[in-house]
Every structure is written in C-alpha cells, then in structure tokens.
Amino acid sequence: MGLGWFGAPEHKRWLAYETHALLHYARAAQVPTGFGWIGQNGEVDPSHPVELWITGRMTFAFSLGALMGIPGCRRYADHGVRALNGPLRDPANGGWYSAIGPEPDAEGRGVPIDPEARKECYQHAFVLLAAATATAADRPGAHELLRDAMAVQDRYWWDEDQQMPVESYAADFTDPEDYRGINAAMHTVEAYLATADVNGEVRWLERALKITDFAVKVPAREPGWSRPENSSA
C-alpha cells in the first residue's frame, strides 16, 4: 500500500490547519523576557522559568510562520529575537543564560534563576537555530543575533579536535564537560544546517557532516547497529 495520501489536497489542508492552530496556541507563551511553559489550561505556568531552549524554539517556530505568511507570527518572532538579544544574554560571561525570571530587573536585564548554572550546548543550539530562521524571515535584530550566535559557536561550542560540539561549560565558559551526547549534537546539526542555508558558508555543512559521521560510525562498530546515547571526548 502506497502513501499517496501525503500529497492529497485534504491532507495538505489538514496540515495547514494544524500549523495555524499550533502557532495560535503558542502565542499564550509570551512573557516579558521571552516565552514560558504553557500549562494544560492554555496559560503560562508560573512554576517554570523562562528557559533558553523554549524561547529559541518558539522564535524558530514563529519565524517559520512569518516565512509562510501566517498572520500575526512576525510580532512573536520579533519578541523572541528581542528576548535573545536582551534579557536572556549573559553580559558578564558571554553566551546566554539557561533560565531567567519572567520579568526583567529595573534596568531591563534578565534575572538568572541560577547565576552559576552551567551553559549547555543543547540550549545554545536553539539560539543559533532561531537566529538563522529569523534572519531568513528578515526580522529586525536577527542578523545581529545570528552573527553573535555564530561567534559563540566558533569560540566555545565547536571542538575542532573532536569534530563534535562540547556538551557544557561552567557559567563562565570554563570547565568543559568530558562528555558527548547525541541529543545536543542532533540539535546542533539542525542549527548548523539552518545557518548554512541562510549564509551559504560551507563550514557549517562540514561540521554537521562530521557530527552525523560520528553518530553513524559508532553504531556501525556495535552489534545490531545499537546507537549509545552517551560517550566521552
């Protein structure tokens, strides 16, 4: 039995409906410093902070909506870009905070939940993904965000010797973790591909290929092509 229904008009209409519904629902996640968790009641759950990865993902999704021409998405994409350019930034150490409060301080800066929290590759990958997609949508401030996100990737996250991203650092980008996880690497591949699509720089494609090559070669050495989630540098 074939899968010809993938291209059927009714299926495409269903996909479009679900896309619009999800983006409309996601609007409720907006808070002053980014995007929060949405609870089962459709409202922001105040028990959760504003997390970097959620704000990055939301900015990515609304930027896609803007590229698709879905009404209302541009303002939410712009809000995400402003949050990533502003309160979620770590002005002292560089990079971005993992989690902040929903309200800025008196000077408009983000208030980190834990100033000593480690910086994670997983979370920073979504900054790059959001920046690249918002740049493709030509959102205000996105080009500058992409420039800075690429610089942070070059300086800290890409390990040229290992040909893999570093998993995490201390808050001040010291103490790199001797661990390589496929989850963070997977999302880094996604972000690198999006970046290459936007700026045409081959090095991002080459890095993505190195990561996927690592992910494939390890299970090739294991019985049954078993892919372990964790490994060391």
Describe each model-derived feature in a short phrase.
Residues 1-233:
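Glycan-recognition and catalytic cores of secretory/periplasmic carbohydrate-active enzymes
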